[in-house]
Every structure is written in C-alpha cells, then in structure tokens.
Amino acid sequence: MKVPVFQLSCLLCLIVCLLCSVKAQKDDQYDTEKSRILEIYNNPAVDEFTKERNIPKLIEFYRRYPARIQLPDADKRQWDEFVARYTESQTKLVDGLPAQGGWVGSVLSSTVGNLIAKFIFSLIRYDPTTPKPTGAH
C-alpha cells in the first residue's frame, strides 16, 4: 500500500505542531512558576514567615527545572545539600507532624538564606525573559 507524499507531509506537520505546542505549554508553566517564586523571594515586602512557608515550592521548582537553573558548581552542591537536609527534616515527625523550628527557623537570615538569594539571583541573571528590577543595570 502506497501512502501519498502529501499525506505523509500532513502527518509530519501535525506531529511537529503538537510537539511545539507541548514545548510552549511547558515554557508557559515554567514562566508562571518562576514569576510566583520571584514574587515571593525577590520582593522585600514579603515577610520571612511567608518565604519560609514557600521553601517546598522553591525546592519543587528546582527539581522540576534543573536544566534551566544555572548555579555555579559550588552553589549547586550547597543547594543540593540544603534540599536533602530540608527534605529529611520534613520527614521526621513529632506527634505525627513535621518538627517545628530547629535549623529551619530563621532560615532566611542564615547561610541558607544567602543560598536561596543566589538561587533567586540565578533565575533573574541567567534568564533573559525575567524582568529586571527598576534601577538595575
């Protein structure tokens, strides 16, 4: 059975269009999630409690888009260590709930806070689609 070239061309075009729309959808999802993260962590008006409460979303974003986040090797190792330590702390239960306080308390005023700042900076610096803060050079 011969399939006309025209039908094969149409099928190929359809496949390419579907693949492009899936990629565009993933880019939109990345941009939306990145915007939410930046609204929280790149905004001085957001309080520390809100930032700490959103650390799981920050970690999830990092795990979902590792290739899009460009951290120097040393920062990446530190970030991976932080993620492992944070995840471990959340799995330890006290009376059926994750432990409160501990090393995560006041996380944003510590070395981990600096690491999160580097992570956010990498989202802004290395992604040309990220709007720069007013007055930035």
Curated annotation (Swiss-Prot):
Q: Does the keyword Flavoprotein apply?
A: no
GO CC annotations, alphabetized = extracellular space
Q: Set out the biological process GO terms recorded for this chain's protein.
A: cellular response to heat; innate immune response; response to bacterium; response to heat; response to oxidative stress
Q: Where in the cell is it found?
A: Secreted
One matching Pfam family is Turandot
Alphabetized UniProt keyword annotations: Immunity, Innate immunity, Secreted, Signal
Q: Which residues form the signal peptide?
A: 1-24
InterPro entries, alphabetically?
Turandot
Q: What does this protein do?
A: A humoral factor that may play a role in stress tolerance.
Similarity remark:
Belongs to the Turandot family.
Q: What is this protein called?
A: Protein Turandot X
Primary gene name: TotX
